[in-house]
Amino acid sequence: MGGCPVRKRRRNGSKEGNHHSTQPKRNKRNPIFQDSQDTEFSWSDNERSSSRINIPERASGPEGNLNQIVTEPDANFPQFLHEGLSKPVYVINWFMSFGPEIKLNTSQQGRNQAV
């Protein structure tokens, strides 16, 4: 049984006697698969204002308080977070984190006012 001799690889990865040219690996990432952190969104003032929901200035009940928190900047509310709330993903994440606290606080305020 005479087999073909096994050829050892050289350090550069090519086989002896192999006439194929080696191509360098590409380090560029496919733009389709970029991380969302790498992508920066820039919204013009027109787009930002048209994406907001028009809410009456004085809404009654706890829902009005929640809407006020989302749409109006407050001294106790970090500016970077308020700017992020113009994007739906940030709004959802923010309410997932702080929604239960806000609901609890507004229901306690309602009890205090009723007493």
Curated annotation (Swiss-Prot):
InterPro entries: VCF1/2-like (IPR029222)
Full protein name: Protein VCF2
Biased composition (Polar residues): 33-44
Species assigned in the record: Homo sapiens
Annotated region described as Disordered, given as residue ranges: 1-70
Lineage, opening ranks: Eukaryota, Metazoa, Chordata, Craniata, Vertebrata
Record family assignment: Belongs to the VCF family.
Compositional bias per record (Basic residues), positions renumbered to this chain: 1-12
